[in-house]
């Protein structure tokens, strides 16, 4: 019952996890996809996040947290999706840094994101 309640509270995080799986992030091989592939999967899943509008934001992490009310888990999944896309490397690094600063500041240690920052 508790799992059901948590999933209901984090529908966006669950949706992002499904998208990550479809993009190949949950497999043992390194995924290879473009930002266009991510947008297509968002559209198929009817994800409420407008990726173009999000990436135009000065601070996409703040936007996700404050406007979309994304959970820590959802943010972690979203950043992982973006990190493995063909988004500009400097932009990915900046977004990853902002996400780590936000999550670490809350006491949510993300092994996945810290591993990405060290690669």
Where are these regions (language model features)?
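Amphipathic alpha-helical binding modules
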Residues: 81-119
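N-terminal alpha-helical interaction modules that lie
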Residues: 1-71, 85, 98-102, 117-118
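Charge-patterned, phosphorylation-rich low-complexity C-terminal interaction regions
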Residues: 75-78
């Amino acid at each position: 019952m508790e799992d059901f309640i948590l999933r209901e509270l984090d529908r966006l995080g669950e949706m992002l996890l499904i998208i990550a799986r479809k993009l190949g992030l949950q497999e043992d091989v390194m995924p290879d996809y473009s930002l266009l592939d991510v947008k297509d999967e968002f559209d198929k899943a009817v994800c409420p996040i407008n990726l173009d509008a999000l990436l135009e934001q000065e601070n996409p992490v703040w936007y996700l947290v404050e406007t979309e009310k994304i959970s820590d888990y959802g943010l972690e999944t979203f950043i992982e999706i973006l990190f493995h896309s063909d988004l500009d490397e400097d932009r990915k690094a900046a977004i990853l840094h902002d996400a780590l600063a936000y999550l670490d500041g809350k006491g949510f240690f993300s092994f996945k994101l810290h591993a990405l920052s060290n690669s």
